[in-house]
Amino acid sequence: MAEPVDLDVAGPVGRPVLVVDFGAQYAQLIARRVREARVFSEVIPHTTSIEEIKARDPLALVLSGGPASVYAPGAPQLDPALFDLGLPVFGICYGFQVMAQALGGTVAHTGTSEYGRTELKVLGGDLHSDLPDIQPVWMSHGDAVTAAPDGFEVVASSAGAAVAAFENRERRLAGVQYHPEVMHTPHGQQILGRFLHDFAGIGARWTPANIANALIEQVRTQIGDGHAICGLSGGVDSAVAAALVQRAIGDRLTCVFVDHGLLRAGERAQVERDFVAATKANLVTVDVADTFLAALSGVTDPEGKRKIIGRQFIRAFEGAVRDVLDGRDIEFLVQGTLYPDVVESGGGSGTANIKSHHNVGGLPDDLKFALVEPLRLLFKDEVRAVGRELGLPEEIVARQPFPGPGLGIRIVGEVTGQRLDTLRRADSIAREELTAAGLDNQIWQCPVVLLADVRSVGVQGDNRTYGHPIVLRPVSSEDAMTADWTRVPFEVLERISTRITNEVPEVNRVVLDVTSKPPGTIEWE
C-alpha cells in the first residue's frame, strides 16, 4: 500500500510545536489547544530521541502529563540534554515534574494529593500576569515539586503544591502543575497562549487560510500531472478533501459517490445536489448496494463488517476506474482521513488500536492507488474551518459527522435490506425532530442504532408486540477524541420516541445512551 504523505509544515504554516506524550489521556487535547492558539502541533512519544527531535526542527516543546510517579521503576524519564537544544519548553503536570527533576529541582511524594478543582494563588511572574490572583485550576497529582531548579521563579502555589508553576524567561522555560488544557481551568488557554506567543515568540500562523494554502500545495506536489479519484460519503471530511484536491488539480479529479446501500434517507440526492453545486467537480455515482449486502451477509462481528466495507469500498473504486472512467490512468485515491481516525486505529506511536476505521485500517494490502489524505493531521473543527475558507456552504461544512461505513455499523447484528429500511426510517425521524428543535449546532452527532438481534415485549392497542429497540446516542464533542452525552430536552426525546414507535412497526422501544467517551466510543461498532 502506498504510504500517505503527511502535511509539509515547513511551508507557509511553519515548523511545529511538538507535544511530548508521557502517557497522558489529554495529550491529543493539548495538541488541539496549541492549534487553537494558531500554532501547528503534533504529538510524539516520550521515547523520541533528541536527534529525532532536532530533525523535526520544532519551534517549541510541550511536555504532557502522565499517570506515573517520577520515582516509580520504569517511569518515563527526560534526558537533561533536551534543554541544551535551546528550545522553549512548557511542562504540564507530570511533564512539569520531570522537567523540574531534569533541571536539578526537587520532586517529592508529599502525602498531599490534589485531584479536581483547586484554587491557585498567583505569586508573580509573567505566565499569569493580568489574570486573577486567585483562580480555579484542574489538578491531578500525587507527587509535587518542592524546590524549583536554580534560576527559576516560583510564580504560583496551591494548598497541595508550594511550587505550582515556575518560569525562566531568559531560557524561555516554564511549567505548571495543573492542567491548562482542560475546560475546568478557565484561564488555561490564555496561559498556554502566553507561553507560545510571549515566551516562545511564535506567531499565530496556523490559520484556515494558511492551512488551506499549504494543503493545496502539498496535494499539487504529490499528484503532479497525475489524475485522482475521490470517494464522497456525503460527510464534511470527504467533501473538504475533495474540494482541496479540486483546487489543486482541477478537472483531473473525478469524484465518485459509492451508493453502498448503507446510506441514510435522502443522502444520495443531497450529495449529487449540494456538493456539485458548491465545487463544480466531476461526479460519478456508482450503485453497488447489492454487492455490499452480499459481502456483509451473515457477518455480525463489528471489525469484520468494517474491514469488509473498506475492502468493498476500494473495489468499487477500481470498478469505477474500469467501467466508468473510460480507462483513463487514475493513480491516486483521495480520502478524508482525520487525525482522530489515525489515533483510534493505532496510527500514533504508543496508541492502542481501539477500532479499525474503514479508511485507515480496513484497506486491502493490494491497493491499486496511492493514497492522498490531505486532512490526515487535522481535527474536525479545523476541517470545517478549511471548508469555509474554500467557500463550501454551511449545508456541507456544518453537517454532523457520519461514518464512512454508514448504517452498516449502526446495526448491531447482521446487515440486511429489511434491517436497513427499519433503521433508515428511525434515523430520519430522529434527525427531523432534532433539526426542528434547533439542536443541530448543539449536538456533535446523534447515531441512531438498531439492536437487530434483540427483541422486547411491548403492547400497542390491545395487541402484544415483540419488536426491536432503537438506541439514541446524542453526543457533544470538540474533536471526537472525547465526548459526553448531550442533554436533549425530554419533550424532544418524547416526540422522537413516539414517532418512531408509531411510524416504524418493527420498533417498539426507544432507549437513550448516556455513556461518555471514554469509556464508550461514539459509534456502537
Swiss-Prot record:
Q: What reaction is this protein's catalytic activity?
A: XMP + L-glutamine + ATP + H2O = GMP + L-glutamate + AMP + diphosphate + 2 H(+)
Q: Which residues cross the membrane?
A: none
Short name of one Pfam family: NAD_synthase
EC numbers on record = 6.3.5.2
Q: Which residues bind ATP?
A: S233, G234, G235, V236, D237, S238, A239
Keywords carried by this UniProt record? ATP-binding, Glutamine amidotransferase, GMP biosynthesis, Ligase, Nucleotide-binding, Purine biosynthesis
Which InterPro entries does the entry mention? Class_I_gatase-like, GATASE, GMP_synth_C, GMP_synth_GATase, GMP_synthase, GMPS_ATP_PPase_dom, NAD/GMP_synthase, Rossmann-like_a/b/a_fold
Q: Where is the Glutamine amidotransferase type-1 domain?
A: 16-205
Cite the SUPFAM superfamilies for this sequence: Adenine nucleotide alpha hydrolases-like, Class I glutamine amidotransferase-like, GMP synthetase C-terminal dimerisation domain
Q: Does the keyword Iron-sulfur apply?
A: no
Provide any one GO MF term from the record: GMP synthase activity
Q: What is the active site of this protein?
A: C93 (nucleophile), H179, E181
Task: Write down any Gene Ontology CC term.
Answer: cytosol
**Segments forming domain GMPS ATP-PPase:** 206-399
Copy the pathway line from the protein's UniProt record. Purine metabolism; GMP biosynthesis; GMP from XMP (L-Gln route): step 1/1
What the protein does comes down to: Catalyzes the synthesis of GMP from XMP.
Listed under subunit, the entry gives: Homodimer.
Query: What protein name does the entry list?
Result: GMP synthase [glutamine-hydrolyzing]
Q: Which organism is it from?
A: Mycobacterium marinum (strain ATCC BAA-535 / M)
- Identify the gene encoding this protein: guaA
